Swiss-Prot record:
Name by which UniProt lists this protein: GTP 3',8-cyclase
Keyword match Calcium: no
SUPFAM superfamilies: Radical SAM enzymes
Record-stated family: Belongs to the radical SAM superfamily. MoaA family.
Subunit structure: Monomer and homodimer.
Class in the EC hierarchy, top level: lyase
Cofactor note: Binds 2 [4Fe-4S] clusters. Binds 1 [4Fe-4S] cluster coordinated with 3 cysteines and an exchangeable S-adenosyl-L-methionine and 1 [4Fe-4S] cluster coordinated with 3 cysteines and the GTP-derived substrate.
Cofactor(s) named in the record: [4Fe-4S] cluster
Keywords: 4Fe-4S, GTP-binding, Iron, Iron-sulfur, Lyase, Metal-binding, Molybdenum cofactor biosynthesis, Nucleotide-binding, S-adenosyl-L-methionine
PANTHER family: MOLYBDENUM COFACTOR BIOSYNTHESIS PROTEIN 1, MOLYBDOPTERIN COFACTOR SYNTHESIS PROTEIN A
Ligand binding ([4Fe-4S] cluster 1): C20, C24, C27
CDD domains given in the database record: Radical_SAM, Twitch_MoaA
Length: 322
């Protein structure tokens, strides 16, 4: 399915829960989400599967499960198993904070999950706690190791870089890539939802790369299959790779191929926009398959061309889906 700018839309990111067991400073307010969705307002697994099945008929081949923290939702393993049985789905990934990953990794792999992205913004225990406001970093390290051992590969580690908060660890993360077979991805700090975005916290992809090359060594470009918005490099002799995602300084919108489905049933054409379509309302009104199909097509045609059309969304990131 093509949007109005001839981009092929084949990727659906699904937030299955608005709750999280961390309180990351760029994702949700310090007090957490005070207006958590009641159970009946959240899409059921059956409703999600129906939307996915119709989406597959329109060309969706790739699914990513997000939250909140998706591993908090009951029945997640059996849901992944049902999702993996849908003919036409070629790839299922998950974005998680990793806290519960040790417990679930093997079962998720056996159910059909292909890979995981783990959010980890510090390698230091005290700083990790300051950024997440709660949480034990050892749980995340153990979860990452268990994911790799279970076969959920490649493991991608997402690092949101914030000046004066964790930018002093850029070199530590880069050196870590020499020892581990992970894809460590530096992400520019974005103004999304009700996060604590401040211009003075922003550090660009180019500055991050420059610091690595000045202090550690040359970044060797690497071509990755299905790399999405990330640009990949490696250090000489490294086991892992370094990725850079730069939504603020690079025109990544030109190759955007995704839609987002929120936990409360809103279909969103763009992370950086408040445009959304209430597909849950249509679904629960007894709409036909064709009506749901037309709703998905309508949402695809709402996708903006690029950043110039964006307004900062009012939802916290945890309710949109990372």
């Amino acid at each position: 399915m093509k949007d109005n700018f001839n981009r092929n839309i084949d990727y659906l990111r699904i937030s299955i829960i608005d709750r999280c067991n961390l309180r990351c400073i760029y994702c949700m307010p310090e007090e957490g989400i005070t207006n958590l969705l009641p159970h009946h307002e959240i899409l059921s697994y059956e409703e999600i599967l129906k939307i996915v099945e119709i989406g597959v008929d329109l060309g969706i081949t790739k699914i990513r499960i997000t939250g909140g923290e998706p591993l908090l939702r009951k029945g997640i393993v059996s849901f992944i198993e049902r999702l993996a049985r849908i003919e036409g789905i070629r790839d299922i990934g998950m974005t998680t904070n990793g806290v519960l990953l040790k417990k679930f990794a093997k079962d998720l792999y056996n159910a059909g999950l292909k890979r995981v992205n783990v959010s980890l913004d510090s390698l230091d225990e005290n700083k990790f706690r300051a950024i997440t406001r709660v949480g034990l970093i050892d749980d995340v390290f153990e979860g990452i190791d268990e994911a790799k051992n279970a076969g959920l590969q490649p493991v991608k580690v997402n690092v949101v870089v914030m000046k004066g908060i964790n930018d002093d660890e850029i070199e530590k993360f880069a050196l870590w890539s020499k020892k581990v077979e992970y894809q460590i991805r530096f992400i520019e700090f974005m103004p999304v939802g009700q996060n604590a975005w401040k211009k003075e916290l922003f550090i660009s992809k180019d500055e991050i790369k420059e610091r690595i090359e000045n202090k550690i060594g040359k970044l060797i470009p690497v071509q990755m299959k299905k790399s999405g918005p990330a640009e990949y490099f490696m250090l000489a002799g490294a086991k892992g790779f370094l990725g850079f995602i730069s939504p603020m300084t690079t025109h990544i919108c030109v190759r955007c191929n995704r839609l987002r489905l929120t936990a409360d049933g809103k279909l969103r054409p763009c992370l950086f926009s408040d445009k959304e379509v209430d597909i849950k309302k249509i679904l629960r009104s007894g709409a036909s398959t064709e009506e749901i199909r037309e709703t998905i097509i309508k949402t695809i045609h709402l996708k903006p061309q690029g950043m110039s059309e964006h307004t900062k969304p009012l939802r916290p990131m945890s309710t949109i889906g990372g």
